[in-house]
Amino acid sequence: MSKTISILGATGSIGHQTLDVAEQLGLRVAALTAHSNAERLEAQARKFRPRLAVLTDEAAAKDLAVRLADTDTRVLGGPEALLEAAVCPEADTVVTAVVGMVGLRPTLAAIREKKRIALANKETLVCAGQLVMDAADAYGAEIVPVDSEHSAIFQCLQGCADRREIKRLILTCSGGPFYGMTAEEVGKMTRADALRHPNWTMGPKITVDCATLMNKGLEVIEAMRLYRLPLDQVSVVIHRQSIVHSLVEYRDGAVLAQLGTPDMRLPIRYAMTYPERAESPAEPLDLLSCPPLTFAQPDREAFPCLRLAEEAAEEGGTACAILNGANEEAVGLFLAEKIGFSDIPRLVAEARAAVAVRQGPSLEDILAADQAARQAVLARA
């Protein structure tokens, strides 16, 4: 069980809920980071009294330093300061809750210090899964997923000593706010429409990814990397109720599922307490009052981002970094209301076609592919 944690991305949805869990479990907080929200990070720092607080926006970091001048918390600014938070010696667990590729280098740094990684930054495994998993093996670092789907699979795999026993992993997907719509109808949806997730409360970027089904596509890639399985052993089903969080089908015909209320504090808590379990204040699942559980095939025509992610996973190399970088840039433009909803998959597909894929990539190759994909999107938006 974790005792002291660092949280990368403390002011976002996952970071905020992680601090709730830390308070409930009595965990100490060694470091907190965010991008630019000095006001919220100040409040968190005053409450949890970390040794280190980081804002990657340097102007905001200067503001935070003034705000926390009367405390013992050291304040650093700039992207490189994330690395210092990731290797903070007091922390035994690093929660990577930042959004996007910015989480990759800090995650690798924490792995080299043999920290437990409570992984909520899926882009790290999507873009550089082989490098990350190889590093975790080499340094003996433990990676425990925080995403509800991968936490569910992680739990369903407890006791599985041989990956050859697995027939397939089944990731559940709510379908997002536009489930059942045609491609034409989906294309007319606005920013406000996309940010209305039916079951979960999350940050804006991941909420849009859920609306396009890119989030599920990224989770397919993450599952392949985390559990070292090929694409044909990872499938997706639509499950509107978000009660079955994912399933594992074994070769003997047994199917194990993890169920629970749609509350991110549950997988966060498990990542903190694993291999133990601790009492939770979250609302328990009442099987007698929950709605009927339904399952359906996803519509890859109306939601092409899922297909684009699967194609990138099949190609390998830097294809997934290109996919992810293009998607991050396109979603940012959509949230800024500079492009329409249907432009997201269009721009991702065009960036994939424009940027060459390299196999067996180094970290530098992955970072270069990410930047090239972003530039390709900006050139075509």
Question: Where does each model-flagged region fall?
Answer:
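Catalytic, metal-anchored helix/loop core of enzyme active sites in primary metabolism
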Residues: 1-381
